[in-house]
Structure formats: structure tokens, C-alpha cells
Amino acid sequence: MKNVSILGSTGSIGTQTLDVIRRNADINVVALAAGTRVSDLAEQVREFKPQLVCIGKEELVPELKTLIGDMDVKIVSGDEGLIEAATIESAEIVVTAVVGMMGITPTVEAIKAHKDIALANKETLVCAGHIIMSLAKECNVNIYPVDSEHSAIFQCLNGERRGEIEKILLTASGGPFRGKKRADLENVQLEDALKHPNWAMGRKITIDSSTMVNKGLEVMEAQWLFGVPAEKVQVIVQPQSIIHSMVEFKDGAVMAQLGSPDMRLPIQYALYYPERRKLNTERLDFYELAKITFEKPDMETFKGLKLAYEAAARGGNIPTALNAANEVAVARFLDRKIKYLDIPDIIEYAMNEVDYINNPTVEQILSTQKIVTDMIESRW
């Protein structure tokens, strides 16, 4: 029996993780943490019976208590509660599926508590990769990627030497606006940007996919996970989302991982690695598929990807500035307060305006986030 704590249990990755667990009797959920979806969290507590449950805001605790007051479960809240869920003694592995930079501190604390990490929170490595990876090595903790692309790379590298990687080929669907030019995106509406062609995801990551900022974050994530510089991570548009990523080695051989676009596969792989379990998901029919196509990404139209490579090259707290600016800009767009093309412009502004810090601490990373957030909110 494996004991699991899930941070972000009511979100897209969290609910799919619970779906995987529901189909496997040998995983026990010991902690659940969510933001504001009280009723969803209460239903999960009733089904999975964890020892501890965390709700994001303290003022929501009374509502949660009315729904699960008869249950034998400890209720905590806020940032401290999230850390308690991440470090609960009985957990062997922590699924970090919270959205945004709030995932950094609980991930750090979970590693210090010697918990393996199933990582679905990009911002943790984008902003604090230099801290996370060295700490994981020091604490002898495994980090298993949950992103479909990074899981694919991880699978391609099984039995291979990291030093023999020539480059990583990170695939992208191209999103709903593939093939469009910047002028075509002037009047994009929220509903258009939320229509991803292949994947069912949360609202924020769906917008990030449409701007290709998500792929830029994945480039930075890959450099830390696999120990390669960002310039050796090449983005390739693969519209069918069948090849989830590839690795090219020194001898010219290329390894690829293929599969139907179903997030339960990388989630299950992270939970059970190195074992593979039966998963009732759609199988690839290569006769039906007939062909797989590739395209070069348009970095002028999708400036967010270009800015991510720039942030990776500059390093320090610049990836944090990019990420923080993107979080604010996407939230503004979701609230219909800015235009779609304002998103990359806001990111570029923040990257140029923030004071550079080399090798930032967690405190400096969070300070950069606040500075950038305040800077953008005062202007937009």
C-alpha cells in the first residue's frame, strides 16, 4: 500500500489523479489540499477518507466543517495547512498539482521531509529549479514529472546516460491559434482561447497553451529536470499530440514516447514508477492515424515562447519575473480586463523592469513575484 498526499486535489490534475487512485486499490490517500472548492473537497474527503484535509482560506473552514464534521479527519487551512499536507508523516509521495508559485514552498518542505514528488506544478522548477534539484539530491528524493511532455522525456531516458543527450525535442500541439499571425489575434475573445484542440485542462494552463507561454515554461522545466541547457531543448509543433516528446542522442538516434492524449497515463506512471499498470485509455490505431506531422513554432506570433528562452538564458530571478507577470496577465485576461495580445507585452515589460538577482533564495523568488505583481497591477 502506497500513501499519497495530493496538493490541488480539486483541480484538473488533482481530480485525474484521484481517478487513477480510484481504479487501483493499493494507493491510500492520506492528505488532500484544495483552494476554494469546498463542496468538491468535501466529496473527496468522504470518498477517500484522508487523515488530513486543507482548504485554502481560513474563512472557508466552518463551511467545510459543516459538510464533513462527522468524519475523522484533521482540518487545516492556508499556507501553513498546505505545508502540513505536504509533510504529513504517513505520506510516501506528494502530488504537487497546485497552480502557480504557491507550489514552491510546500514542495521544498516535502523534499526536506524526504517525500518523493510527483511534480505537476511547473512554477516550482521554472522559478526555483536551482534550489529544488540540489535539495532533492541532498535529501535522496525522487522527482517524477507529471507533465505529459516531461514524463515522455523521462520514459525515453530510462536506461540511458544523461551525458549522452544531444538535445531534447519538446513537442507542442500549437494550441487553438496554430497557423495564425499576430494580426489575426488582435480581437481574440476569451472563449476562443479556452478551446484547446486536444487536451482537457484547467483554464489558466489552457490560456498558457494558446499563447505558447506554457511551452516556454516547459523548456525551463526540462533544463532542470534533465540537466541540459535551454538551448538544447528544441520545441517542435506536433498538432496531433500523439508524440509527447523525444530525445536525440549523441549518435543521432532519436527515442520518442507516443500515446493518446490522456493525462492519466503520466500521472499513473509517476505514482507507480518503475512499474507499468493497466490503464483503460484509448489506444493508438496507426492505420486510422495514418500520419503524424511536424511544424516549426512561430516565435514572432507567439512571443511568449521567445521570451521564455530569453528568461532561461538570463537566469537568476528573470524566469520568476516572466512567470509572475504571466500569472497576473492571464488572470486579467480571464476577467476580461486586458486584450489577448497584452499578455506577452506585459511579460516582456516585467522582464525588462525587474532588478536582476543571481541565484535567488526562496524568499527572493517570492519577493520578485510580489514586486512584479504590484508593478503590473498598478499599470494594467
UniProtKB/Swiss-Prot annotation:
Keywords: Isoprene biosynthesis, Manganese, Metal-binding, NADP, Oxidoreductase. Transmembrane segments: none annotated. One of its GO terms (molecular function) is 1-deoxy-D-xylulose-5-phosphate reductoisomerase activity. Its EC number is 1.1.1.267. The keyword Lipoprotein does not apply. Its cofactor is Mg(2+); Mn(2+). Mn(2+) binds at residues 147, 149, 218. Pfam families: DXP_redisom_C, DXP_reductoisom, DXPR_C. PANTHER family: 1-DEOXY-D-XYLULOSE 5-PHOSPHATE REDUCTOISOMERASE, 1-DEOXY-D-XYLULOSE 5-PHOSPHATE REDUCTOISOMERASE, CHLOROPLASTIC. It comes from Lachnospira eligens (strain ATCC 27750 / DSM 3376 / VPI C15-48 / C15-B4). This is 1-deoxy-D-xylulose 5-phosphate reductoisomerase.
